[in-house]
Amino acid sequence: MKVLFLTIALSLFSILQAQDSSSSEEQFEGTYFVKAIVTDSEFFEKNKPKALSPLTVTHLSNGDLEAKFTTNMNGICEEIKMKFEKTDKPGIFSTNDGSRQVLIEKTSVRDHWILFCEGELHGMQVRIAKLLGPHTDENPKAFQEFKKFVSLKRFNEEKINIPRQTETCIPEHV
């Protein structure tokens, strides 16, 4: 259960860490769905979540991000909150004392983002890329841009996963 939790948390943390601090008109903030995900880590391949709940991202006044999502493991709903600290590099945030970094790239499709996470987990280097969007509807143009990004970062395109979307559960302690 801890491995599954870590898998989901790392997977979703990378979603949360991304806002370009440049003068972009759009901000990475609001509710997003993971539309596609790819990794080169066997650990994540074996433990990838089959369904993901929406992610709510809030831009904090100091430039950091806070993200919230829920996970339902063995019938128990839990809300996860994470804080991601901005770095001196535009578009890059860190977490876990800097052991993980996420780069965010805006696609040409409104409100669609590509997140690229690199870091260490259990002594292994892990790379994950995700396509996020505000709705569960497919967007072929955004997906094509994601595939191009995946290819440029030398991921195996055949390992792109389209996760099932699930509703946010309500934790008992709320």
Swiss-Prot record:
Record bears the keyword RNA-binding: no
Tissue: Mammary gland specific. Secreted in milk.
Classification via CDD domains: lipocalin_1_3_4_13-like
Keyword field: Disulfide bond, Milk protein, Secreted, Signal, Transport
Main localization category: secreted
Disulfide cross-links: C77-C169
Cleaved signal peptide residues: 1-18
GO CC annotations, alphabetized: extracellular space
Pfam families: Lipocalin
Compartments where found: Secreted
Entry GO MF terms: small molecule binding
Annotated family: Belongs to the calycin superfamily. Lipocalin family.
PANTHER family with a match to the protein in the record: LIPOCALIN, LIPOCALIN 1-LIKE PROTEIN 1-RELATED
Function of the molecule: Probably serves a role in the transport of a small ligand released during the hydrolysis of milk fat.
Protein name according to UniProt: Late lactation protein B
Organism encoding this protein: Notamacropus eugenii
Species lineage: Eukaryota, Metazoa, Chordata, Craniata, Vertebrata
Gene (name only): LLPB
